[in-house]
Amino acid sequence: MADNTGTEGTGCSGWFLVEAIVENTTGQQISEDEDEAVEDSGLDMVDFIDDRPITHNSMEAQALLNEQEADAHYAAVQDLKRKYLGSPYVSPLSNIEQAVECDISPRLDAITLSRQPKKVKRRLFDRPELTDSGYGNTEVEAETQVERNGEPEDCGGGGQGRDTEGVEQVETEVQTHSNTQQHTGTTRVLELLKCKNIRATLLGKFKDCYGLSYTDLIRQFKSDKTTCGDWVIAAFGVHHSVSEAFQNLIQPVTTYSHIQWLTNAWGMVLLALVRFKVNKNRCTVARMMATRLNIPEDHMLIEPPKIQSGVAALYWFRSGISNASIVTGETPEWITRQTIVEHGLADNQFKLADMVQWAYDNDFCEESEIAFEYAQRADIDANARAFLNSNCQAKYVKDCATMCKHYKTAEMKKMNMKQWIKFRSSKFEDTGNWKPIVQFLRHQNIEFIPFLTKLKMWLHGTPKKNCIAIVGPPDTGKSCFCMSLIKFLGGTVISYVNSSSHFWLQPLCNAKVALLDDVTQSCWVYMDTYMRNLLDGNPMTIDRKHKSLALIKCPPLIVTSNIDITKEEKYKYLCSRVTLFTFPNPFPFDRNGNALYDLCETNWKCFFARLSSSLDIQTSEDEDDGDNSQAFRCVPGTVVRTV
C-alpha cells in the first residue's frame, strides 16, 4: 500500500503555521563579549557618572597626578631637545666667537665642562642673522658662508672662525650644488642692507659704481621737512623692467630730469637729478620714488644738489652730453651759470653801488631785509651771486643799509610837506574813500571845518600850533586814528618808556612827523619842564648817541592821552602850545567785531587829495603834468666818447 505522502497523521487536523522572530538583521556586527541571551535592562549605565561627593584625599590624588604628568611631559620635551638640537659650539655659523676658541685650543676646549659667560662688546656693525629655513638648512649655511668669504666688503664686521670639518663640508656643497647657489640682485641687496649703518653702506657702493663720492654732488638737509625744487636721487636694487619706464613715470611731475643707469651684481642702480614742478620735501620725494621704482625707501639716497659747486655743475654738464645719460627739459640755471664762460667771468666782481641802488629802489633800509631779499636774487642777478660768494657779506649789508638810510633821509629833508604828502600818496595804488574819516570825526563831536583849519597849521609847522593832542576816555579810537595818520605820512613813533635815556628823542632828527602815544601824568610833567621850546616849533638841540648834538626844528607832533590838561592849572603853559581835540564816544564796531569806520592809509590818501585846497597842499598845474626831475641814481653811468 502506497505511502500517504502529504497527508496528516492521526490526531492532526489542518496546517501548523510557524513564524520566526528575527532579532539581528543581515550584516549587523555582533560583539563577541556581549551576552545575547540577557535582556537589556539599562542597569549597566547606572554607575557611568560618579556623583559621589569629592573627599579631601581624592583632590590630593588628582593634584599629584597632574604634577606627575607635567613632569613627564617636560622631561620628554628636554629629551627631544637634546636629541634634535645641535651643539652651538660645533657649528661656526651659530657661534663664531666660541668656534674660534675651539680652533685655537681644541684640547683645552675638549676638557671644558661648562662655558664661562663672556662680556658684551660693542660692534660697529651687527652680524647678519642666519635664519633657519628648515628644509635645506645645510645648503643655505654653506651658500651664505662662501659668499661672505668671497665678497671684498663684509657688513658684519669681525672674523669668521670655522673648524676643518665645516670647511670641507662647505667646499663639498659648493662643488656639488654650484648651480643652485647663485643669488639674484635683489637677494644680494637685501642681505647687504641687513647692516646697521645702511647709509654708510650705500655711500660706499655708490662710490664703487660711479667713481665719485655722493657727498660731492649734494648738500645735506638735516630735516626731512625742508622743501626744495631740485633733488639728487640714488636708488639701489631696481628691477630692469622698471628702469625702462622710469623716464615716462616721472615726466608728468618734473620740468627737468637727468637719469643715469648702471648695472652691477645688485641689479640696476639709478642716479638722477630731478627738478619738480612744485617744491617737495625729502619724505614726499621718497614716497613718490618708492612707488615708481618699487623699492623700499631706505634703499635710496635723497639730497638736494650742491648748486654753488663748480665741480658738481661740471659733472652734470659733462655727463649730460654723453650717451650714458637721459636728459629731458631745460638745464637748470645753476648748471648753466657755472659752466658757461661769460657767466663765470661776470660772477667774479661784486659792486656795492648796484646793491645800494637796488635797496634804494625797493625801499629796503633794514639790514635783515636787505640781506634776505638780495640773497634771493642770486639766480637772476650776477652781482647778488658775487655777494653770496664774498666773505664780507655782513660788512656789505651794513654799508648798504647805512648808505640807503642816508639817501632816504636826504631825499625826505629836501621835500616840503606838500611834496612829501604827494610822494607818500604815490606809494598807494588804491584811491580809497575819504568819507569814513569825516564820519568818525562827526561821531566824536568834532567840528569838521575847525579841525581842517588846525590840521592845516599843524602840517605846515606853525609856531604854537605844532602839536596836536587828542584826549578822552579809553577805547575811543584815539590811538587808531593817530596811528593810521602817522603810517600814511611815514612818520616815526617815540615812547616815554625810554625817557631815562638821553637819546629817546633822537628819532625826531630824521622824521617828517612824529607821534607820542598814551601820554601819562609824568610825561606831561616832563614836557612842561623840558619840552616847551620843542612844542613851540622852534629850533632846539637833540642829543644823539655816538654823535654830536643836532640842531633841529621839531617836526609836527601828535600826542594821545587820557588826561585833559586844560582842566588842571599846573599845565597852563602847555595849553597855549598844544591844540586839543576830545574824543568822548567809544569806537563803534559791527556785530562781527569789525570797525565801523575804516581808518586805513588809502582812505587818508583820498582825504588829502579831496581836501588839498583847504589844507593848502594842492599841486600847481605845472606839477600835474609830471615830475621833470631825474630819478635818483647812485650807480655811475657810462660815458660815450665820440671821435
Curated annotation (Swiss-Prot):
Coiled coil: none annotated. It is found in: Host nucleus. The modification Phosphoserine is found at residues 87, 91, 105. It is an enzyme of class 5 (isomerase). There is a cross-link at residue 553 (Glycyl lysine isopeptide (Lys-Gly) (interchain with G-Cter in SUMO)). Its main location: host cell. Its EC number is 5.6.2.4. ATP binds at residues 472-479. A motif (Nuclear localization signal) lies at residues 81-83. GO terms for biological process: DNA replication. ATP-dependent DNA 3'-5' helicase required for initiation of viral DNA replication. It forms a complex with the viral E2 protein. The E1-E2 complex binds to the replication origin which contains binding sites for both proteins. During the initial step, a dimer of E1 interacts with a dimer of protein E2 leading to a complex that binds the viral origin of replication with high specificity. Then, a second dimer of E1 displaces the E2 dimer in an ATP-dependent manner to form the E1 tetramer. This is Replication protein E1. The lineage of its organism: Viruses, Monodnaviria, Shotokuvirae, Cossaviricota, Papovaviricetes.
